[in-house]
């Protein structure tokens, strides 16, 4: 029985709403047939390479390197294509050129004695690599990925073969003319970037772009311009989304984490958050307090700090931590249904005796200097703290780059994603065993 024999007047009427909708894009039988042929053909192409990254935590240099080499996929392609026809050192040189074309070209030009000959060999090698990585895509998809400046030339090189006698001279002249017109450097850079792009068909960021690293904003700059990606939000990403949405407890938390790891670059340089009011407040409030236990973890710091700067960051860390406790407690009081009463910590402190009381047990405090905490009303912000948090709020709400990056997170992100029969989500999901089933 054919598919056509299943079509009845009743089924047409039942599907009329969908047929009318489809007719907007495919008004004729020919248009619909062409699209069906195209989609059926695409389904029989090899699946594009999916790249999964998680827990980046602001480490932008590692992130960018992994994107450039596609976690070793480029190296594998080069080995498959050239095998034993190139020495290992030559394959490594070619891979490095693909990863970092601008930098590698400068090194090559400083040492190569016959640069035109090197251009000729390298361009032919790059064409072979590009033909390989583009082979799993339709010509239409490859064409849309090409740089406009060299689109026509690259299409000719990708889809014509030097083995064909009638095209051998044609291809060779294209390459030699690229060299003679002094466009080889730009063309090589364009080809290397294209190889990087085609090697990764889709990028999955499975949580935590933000946290302790110094360059989360640089990572977000890269993602905002990336060709195909999705994000499954991690706890640190959601924290920044909350801060950018105006939640002051989240603002205090992201600042505290930055102080803890000595990374101020994302806040100050990336998003223009003014930390001067916090520094002034911390120096005044904790002038004689060493704040020892709030010293930053300098092995994660974005730069080397002198002793004076480290002391200031330590004071700022303590100041914003106390403010965070107060702001979070106010939310918990306002929303008891959250069931987070156990997170209200300041009320569990016996300030006179310097102990923390939890479930009937007492724990001595390692720090007992809390000049901004009123034991009778521990979660009330002082006037100075209230003024400070208003200034911090203003900085967060008026950062244009932060708004851009958070729009990207909201647009391309979600709590989870089902893709190619994979369930993607950050961290873990609690399971309950019911009989023989996990739910």
Task: Kindly give the residue locations of the regions a language model identified.
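Feature recognizes metal-dependent phosphohydrolase scaffolds
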Residues: 2-439
